[in-house]
Amino acid sequence: MADIQKSEATLVKKVWDIANVLAAAGVGFTDYITQLTYILFLKMDAEKEELGLGSSIPDGYKWKDIVELNGDDLIDKYEEVLKELSKDDGLIGTIFTKASNKINSPVHLAKVFQMVGNENWYMMEGDFKGAIYESILEKNGQDKKSGAGQYFTPRALIKAMVDVIDPKITETVADPACGTGGFLLAAFDHMKPQSKDLSKQNFLKNNALFGADNTALVVTLASMNLYLHDIGTEKSPIVCQDSLLDTSDRMFDVILANPPFGTRPQGSVAVDSARPEFIKTSDNQVNFLQHIMSIVKTGGRVAVVLPDNVLTDGNATAKVREKLLADFNLHTILRLPTGIFYAGGVKTNVLFFEKGEKTRDIWVYDYRTGIKHTMVTKPMTRADLDGFVNCYCSGHLEDRKETYSEENPNGRWRKFSEEEVYSRDQLKLDFKWIDLTEKDDRTITELLSEMQEKATAIGDAVSKLQEILGGIDL
């Protein structure tokens, strides 16, 4: 195991060393990872063909047609290959969705080809090569300069959510805002050991998972992430689509998601034009909640990350809460601390609910009050959520026991009765009870890190505002 981890770390370092070289030349981290993905797929296809297993890529557009070229010939051929492969209507087309070259220097592009060419990827175990790629995605997601953090959910939180939802190998799992595929991959890892039956394993690899994202770049990364774990090797389970406009009738047993927050981007198709049954709102997170409610099967289970406003806002949001409590059993809320996401100050929760019965009691685990995390200096670990996972009692919710009591008023696990839930103004679900008057024990390093995270978030917001205002005559 130690040798495997060392090899993984060595490969990740090689990949990131080139990333730093390219960054100095003006190639962004995320653009580099995307090009690496395209080139890695070409190399793996070539290795597959050498083993007599056939090629998925048409003649004239393969690894061997590019790798010996240099200078402008390399750039021209590479761009021709990307354009051609993006036309495919299967797995290749998904990975090469709207593919274009972002490395304009032949010397730098050749470095990436050389680095990928020096390794044999296809025969690596799926867990190993997948772990390498995931490590790269995670490093990219944590790097503030990359801007990729908006697509990244902490692995510790993903793992805890999957552990308590407990998807089964015969069930279908969806993430309608899948990012780089973290939830789907964690669900796969959870389901795979449950049976060695070949038909069940085949179903798991090719039919059980579904993910969607409306950003071509993210679809490429998610598709490759799953492909490297031997998932969807014939047809990717990831599609490039705006989930909020999806009117298909496909339903799922389990939904796991951390949808984008904020308002819908300017110029987007209005959600209510495609989904007239939705309660009309401009909030992305509330619309995603409505979408999730519409695609989970009766008896199905949901775990979704949502900001505080979904629990407290009035008007349309209050009406969505009313529908949620009437048609679903919202049995659990996990209150999350700040500092675990790219947008450092956002306050979030995980809502756990099942379709079929109305909400009665709601159990709340407060992992926010008095808890401090940052993405860099004090990241959340899976062990940090052991208390919540143990209290949740997955599979036997009837055995739950509060840690809160009159004798222990700061217990983090508390049940709110049906009467308490439905007597709240506008069914607001912002349950708070812990009173910890603690000194602020953050170090200077932690404070500076939090300040940097917030400054980055503000800078990103200003840049987006400038883009919006750029086309307006003020």
Residue ranges and their predicted role:
Residues 20, 36, 188, 223-224, ...:
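Residues within alpha-helical segments
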Residues 30, 128, 153, 217, ...:
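A generic structural signal for residues located within well-ordered alpha-helices
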Residues 1-2, 245-252, 262-418:
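Signature of N6-adenine DNA methyltransferases within the class I
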Residues 1-169, 234-243, 335-338, 360-375, ...:
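Non-catalytic, mostly N-terminal accessory regions of nucleic-acid modification and defense proteins
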Residues 121, 200-202, 295, 400:
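Surface-exposed acidic, glycine-flexible loop patches that form ligand/cofactor-binding
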